[in-house]
Amino acid sequence: MRDRPPTSVGTWSPHGLRQLSPRMNSSVESRIDYLVRSEYATLKFLETTTVPAPRAFDFGIAGDTDNKVGVSYILMEEMAGRTWNMQGPHGKRSADGNDKERSRISSPRSLPSKPIVSAVASDRFLVLSPSGPFATAKDYYTSFVEQNMALIADGQLFPSFPVNAYLVFLFLKSQIPNLASTANRNIETTEQFYIKHVDDKGDHLMVDDELNIVGIIDWQMARVVPANEAFGPSLVTAEMGDIYNGVSSLTVHDHGLARFLKAKGEDDLADIMRKDEKLRRFFFGLDVDFSWNETLLLIRGIWAAFGMDKNTDRKVWKTDMLDQHMHDERLMNIIDSFGAGP
């Protein structure tokens, strides 16, 4: 799911006061409060690393009696620079080796805690109810799919073709055991978990005129994820035209980053980066603003990423999936409520 507006909007003052105000009323306020606490805790953790994130000085919750501001807020450092737009001097698209060294964490290893995936503040700006903690990557991925299927069944997602969309997420759910398995059981990092910024597009990066990374902002929906997601192909290194046109493959940017990691001696991370784009497709999913014909191209890309023939007859596939899941009560309710769809 892409580019849905968040249920909260952040505004920056010249003094670094970030105000979080709901676009909707009722229960959203408690979720806003959760995001405030989550972002503040994340920023305080990042202060112990070399990640160029804003320093956080204070936060307040709207309902607290000692909050004199009146709204939920975080008081943080204002970062210099401008938002990276994937372009720059001499056509420079990607950060070079010096950029990566400047922004490098002292060691790309896991959080100093026992191996669980913590509560998720959000998944792609849609579901703000905290999920987790999870004991395994499999549980984490399953929660993501289940939340989407619940929203489809409720009529909140893909109302024009809910049955087809639900079947796609059932397909993704069937692939989770493969996603959760590690490429090499001897690689320590593949069974540990890492803080990951929710935005893969790159506009959270602040750069100077030479495109040196000077800051990373907007941490309010950061989450803790398995290594394959943290260090695998993301939207920063994707070719979006391929994604929207049903083409699945690693890009030159995926391979370029893998080569850089290998050159720096991070062979395990390089292996994750150049493995495949399954997780990129898994979390990208479908686009809520697309027509059925456009969505079908995304589905074909998902099929290709997971080893299916992208030119599979979609009607035959749908019939097979319906037969396999005829005892899925939620699916049957969707058909009864919305019809079988295209």
Predicted segments with their positions:
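ATP-binding pocket architecture of kinase catalytic cores
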Residues: R2-Y166, L170, Q175, S181-I195, ...
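Short beta-strand-initiation
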Residues: T7, D200-K201
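Intrinsically disordered, low-complexity intracellular terminal segments
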Residues: R82, S107-I195, K201, D208, ...
